[in-house]
Structure formats: structure tokens, C-alpha cells
Amino acid sequence: MARVTVEDCIDKVDNRFDLVLLAAHRARMISSGSQLTIDRDNDKNPVVALREIADSTISPEDLKEELVHSLQKFVEVDEPEPDTVPLIGSAGASVDADDTEVAVERMTEEELLKGLEGLAPPEEQPEEDE
């Protein structure tokens, strides 16, 4: 059997580095029990993976998808958002009629400062050394 080199596979995957990543991922898949698409012929898993890519029995695009999926730690699921989001306190919400006429009292800065001056400062507590 002739040796499989990167040159045999370079027409299937343009980038040599991508080819190595894909072949290594396929070799790991074979090690974990994935079905072979060609005869083993007493070859090791990386050689079998390269032969599968060279013979086009495995799609490089599918291998790339599987590689990306295996490296993801969190898979984000896109859910359609509703067209309109109900606002809090909108007219459509169940609000009592009495709540709509609440008057908010405004304070000036001077009134706020006077109110703060009237507050008692917190008592100082002695620090305990442990």
C-alpha cells in the first residue's frame, strides 16, 4: 500500500493546517469507536483518517462542523423574539385607576441637604483586634 501524505489530500482541503486538524479529529473519532469508511489495511488511525479524506469518503465540511461542535462548551440556541415586548406600567397592563393619579413630590437640592443634616451619624464602634 502506498503511503498517504498531505500532498494526496491537499486538493480536498486547501490549507495544510486545517487538514491536520481535521485528520486529527477524525483519528480521535475512530479511536472512540466511529465506523470506518474504508478498509483499515493494518494502518493506524491518523493514516486511516488521511486516507478517508483523500478518497473523499468523508466530507471535509462535515468534519469541520463536527470539530467545531466538539470544541464548543456552550451551544447558543436562537429563539425568535416576540414582535412587541410589553412595557412595565403600560396602559395594557392591569393597573388600578387609583394608581394612575399618584402625585410625586419633588425635592430641591437644599431640602435634601437639610434632611440629610437632620440624620444622626452612625455610632462609632471600637475595633476589636483578633
Swiss-Prot record:
Record EC number = 2.7.7.6
Look up the domain of life of the source: Bacteria
> InterPro entries recorded for this chain?
DNA-dir_RNA_pol_omega, Pol_omega/Rpo6/RPB6, RPB6/omega-like_sf
| GO cellular component term of the entry, any | DNA-directed RNA polymerase complex
**Top EC class, one word:** transferase
Q: Where is this region: Disordered?
A: 110-130
Query: Per the UniProt entry, what is one GO biological process?
Result: DNA-templated transcription
Gene3D superfamilies to which the protein is assigned, alphabetical: 3.90.940.10
- Catalytic reaction equation(s): RNA(n) + a ribonucleoside 5'-triphosphate = RNA(n+1) + diphosphate
Give the keywords, sorted. Answer: DNA-directed RNA polymerase, Nucleotidyltransferase, Transcription, Transferase
A GO molecular-function term, please? DNA binding
What the record says about family reads: Belongs to the RNA polymerase subunit omega family.
Q: What does this protein do?
A: Promotes RNA polymerase assembly. Latches the N- and C-terminal regions of the beta' subunit thereby facilitating its interaction with the beta and alpha subunits.
Q: How does it assemble?
A: The RNAP catalytic core consists of 2 alpha, 1 beta, 1 beta' and 1 omega subunit. When a sigma factor is associated with the core the holoenzyme is formed, which can initiate transcription.
Q: What is this protein called?
A: DNA-directed RNA polymerase subunit omega
This chain's source organism reads: Bradyrhizobium sp. (strain ORS 278)
